[in-house]
Amino acid sequence: MSDSTTIARPYAKAIFEHALAEKKLSEWSEYLTLLAQVVLTPQATQFIANPASTDEQQIELLIEVCGSKFKKNDALNNLIKLLTTNKRLMLLPEIEALYEVYRAEQEKILEVDVVSYSELTPAQQQRLSESLSQRLSRKVSLKISIDPSLLGGALIRAGDLVIDGSVRGKLNMLGTSLAA
């Protein structure tokens, strides 16, 4: 476990508990995703790392870039101020990732990685999501990527479960059985 994860965990847990109490899990997910994306831009990273930029300037930048939602949210503004004062802004991507883990556990959602040979239609995505939800007894969130080297089919990873329905996987299994 990295030091950044250890440092980010209490922030993520506190944000999650606040969002849960306020029943605003998805809103906070959006906020954290946006903040994480902003601090990862080269310009923001350079500005935050610059010793000449003050905490107030960094806070103002984040609130300005993130828009009007942020100006009305005291808890979010306090979070930005706290992270800035403690020099933890660059932990926002880690905080966001940990928050999403807590949220998924709370909502009983499992993130499923699907690597497909070609683009899946919305109907195929819906059928796959329903089938996996039924098999895993949880809601699933599909994270789909394309890999033409699969030659056809798809590779599905859900936690410890791996389903290799790709042509490449079947050819590898056939080659292994013929070699034995």
UniProtKB/Swiss-Prot annotation:
**Matching Pfam families:** OSCP
PANTHER family from the UniProt entry: ATP SYNTHASE DELTA CHAIN (PTHR11910)
Q: Which organism is it from?
A: Legionella pneumophila subsp. pneumophila (strain Philadelphia 1 / ATCC 33152 / DSM 7513)
Gene name in the database record = atpH
Tree of life domain: Bacteria
Subunit text:
F-type ATPases have 2 components, F(1) - the catalytic core - and F(0) - the membrane proton channel. F(1) has five subunits: alpha(3), beta(3), gamma(1), delta(1), epsilon(1). F(0) has three main subunits: a(1), b(2) and c(10-14). The alpha and beta chains form an alternating ring which encloses part of the gamma chain. F(1) is attached to F(0) by a central stalk formed by the gamma and epsilon chains, while a peripheral stalk is formed by the delta and b chains.
Q: Name one GO cellular component term.
A: proton-transporting ATP synthase complex
Main localization category: membrane
* Function summary: F(1)F(0) ATP synthase produces ATP from ADP in the presence of a proton or sodium gradient. F-type ATPases consist of two structural domains, F(1) containing the extramembraneous catalytic core and F(0) containing the membrane proton channel, linked together by a central stalk and a peripheral stalk. During catalysis, ATP synthesis in the catalytic domain of F(1) is coupled via a rotary mechanism of the central stalk subunits to proton translocation. This protein is part of the stalk that links CF(0) to CF(1). It either transmits conformational changes from CF(0) to CF(1) or is implicated in proton conduction.
User: In Gene Ontology terms, what is one molecular function of this protein?
Assistant: proton-transporting ATP synthase activity, rotational mechanism
Report whether Cell division shows up as a keyword of the record.
Answer: no
Q: Where is the signal peptide?
A: none
List locations, semicolon-separated.
Cell inner membrane
Asked whether the keyword Cell inner membrane is assigned, the reply is yes
Alphabetically sorted, this entry's keywords are: ATP synthesis, Cell inner membrane, Cell membrane, CF(1), Hydrogen ion transport, Ion transport, Membrane, Transport
Q: What membrane topology term does the record carry?
A: Peripheral membrane protein
Question: Which family, according to the similarity comment?
Answer: Belongs to the ATPase delta chain family.
NCBIfam families registered for this protein in UniProt: ATP_synt_delta (TIGR01145), PRK05758.2-2 (NF004402)
Q: What is this protein called?
A: ATP synthase subunit delta
